[in-house]
């Protein structure tokens, strides 16, 4: 992502969006926008706009954050070992904007690969299926057909 465009986008973020994506912050569980979203659509990186997750892969993990079994395209997320807070975890960042998204854990549904991508709502923008074309994401409509 072009640095000037990234800086422009960063200036448009709310405090919580900036804290989560740029300072690896975490939202409060059950008090965020998408933890219980049941609408069909895709979730894009709040900074770069790159598609990251689909509602088709979202499930209720009971953790209080949006949870997904997989990204739309694995190339759009980067995983790093995270040793903060006295834990060993795997951090998930967006490949294009290097935004902190959340963490991935090996306790997801076994029949869908066994992973749980636990992602902060503040790192995401939701595009409903009926707005995909209008927002420039028409290529992703096929996911829902």
Curated annotation (Swiss-Prot):
Enzyme Commission designation: 1.8.4.12
Domain MsrB: 6-129
Keyword annotations: Oxidoreductase
One family name in Pfam for this protein: SelR
Record flagged with keyword Oxidoreductase: yes
An example Gene Ontology biological process: response to oxidative stress
Top EC class, one word: oxidoreductase
InterPro entries: Met_Sox_Rdtase_MsrB, Met_Sox_Rdtase_MsrB_dom, Mss4-like_sf
An annotated Gene Ontology molecular function: peptide-methionine (R)-S-oxide reductase activity
Catalytic activity field: L-methionyl-[protein] + [thioredoxin]-disulfide + H2O = L-methionyl-(R)-S-oxide-[protein] + [thioredoxin]-dithiol
Residues annotated as catalytic: 118
Entry keyword Membrane: no
One GO CC term, this protein: cytoplasm
Entries under PANTHER family matching the protein: METHIONINE SULFOXIDE REDUCTASE, PEPTIDE METHIONINE SULFOXIDE REDUCTASE MSRA_MSRB
Protein family per UniProt: Belongs to the MsrB Met sulfoxide reductase family.
Protein name: Peptide methionine sulfoxide reductase MsrB
Source organism per UniProt: Listeria monocytogenes serotype 4b (strain CLIP80459)
Gene: msrB
